[in-house]
Amino acid sequence: LSLPQNFSLDNFAEAMRVTDFWHSLGNSIIITAATIILSLVIHSMAGYAIGRNMSRKKGFKLVYFYIVSGMFVPFAILMMPLVKQTANLGLDNMAGVIILYTVFYMPMNVMLYSGYMKNVPMAMEEAADMDGASAWRTYWTIIFPMMKPMHATVAVLTALGTWNDVMTPLVIMSGSDNITLPLAQLNFQTQFG
């Protein structure tokens, strides 16, 4: 083994050309950013509602366990029915993958948000209620900003899972225009060994 005779970046340029690197990178960024935004909004609202009401109302505990039980279902079991359903609904594109990721990460994120909400005191919400704020305004102006540490945790976990996933875009999206960066790297798995 020795160093190469001539230093060259041609291999990197060829790799970027073969994978359509910039287009794949853009697709990955769009899918990841949209999934994070939808997850933060939808999952935080669900976690807030469940976390605040689980100890007081029996129905919320059942909903919580129903949602969290989704963590025990592996993707391999859901893969073939999802391919058929997304194709029938016309969601075999980036929008379909974003929706699926948002649903896939819901059990974990709702569990995190509801656990966080159990430890947040009710005093701020009660004060907003006394001032005449609606539940919607209380959530967006008081509760949502108070959940910043959990937003950061959910954003990082969702981003890592979305960015590194190969299987979901591979089986859901059709056409080479929609490939993500991890999916584009599959070209090299069989091409060079």
Regions picked out by a protein language model, each given a short descriptive name:
Residues L1-G193:
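A structural signal for multi-pass alpha-helical bundles of membrane permease subunits
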